């Protein structure tokens, strides 16, 4: 092999090595770019999957109470309207229509169920029934809050609960007068009254009890009456009330 041939072979080898180097460099560069881009894509996917948590204890739900009006669709739906107003104060988006299917219904048991039809002029229940209804609404959503029947507590206990920033659903009267009892009873102990009405109490201050009334269209349904007057009517209605608690997870 002469020298010229050797030089040509050497040139070809150098050219091949150079070309191979370019190819390897290009592959390496692409790989580096892919590695730089990939984490950004992963981060974006992770951010999209992070849930937004709304269900957490609120500092002062009583301050969030707004009346939910029951008319004209639900003439006797004050219990459901009060429940919607109450739950909304805790950050939920409840409507009367959402709660009606969650209620138990009965022809005579207004302690654990609802008698009648909220879309008519005849329909009523007591605190235990509404607690069941609201928890039937809350449990399937895996919420942290549950409602509890606190009927029978003293007035001081009631005031302390309200003053802690927690609202309460109470059984009152629709005309703000004493209850007018009927002959409708359950277990020969519980007696229904014809002017029964549910409201949501959210404040007691300077001798005035403030509550949201689903039948009052003035002042966005917010009403205030003297504490001694409210207490007398509430106790005559059986001191019925509903509060809440947060479950441990």
For each feature predicted by the language model, list its residue ranges.
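Short coil/turn linker and secondary-structure boundary residues
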Residues: 94, 125, 153, 221-225
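Active-site-adjacent structural segments surrounding the nucleophilic cysteine of cysteine proteases
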Residues: 7-129, 174-176, 181-184, 189-192, ...
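Sec-exported extracytoplasmic/periplasmic mature domains
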Residues: 83-95, 104-108, 135-143, 163, ...
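Predominantly the structural core of cysteine protease catalytic domains
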Residues: 117-198, 202-205, 241-244
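Positively charged n-region of N-terminal signal peptides that target proteins for export
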Residues: 1-6
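Noncatalytic regulatory segments and standalone regulatory/sensor domains
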Residues: 37, 178, 182-193, 202-249
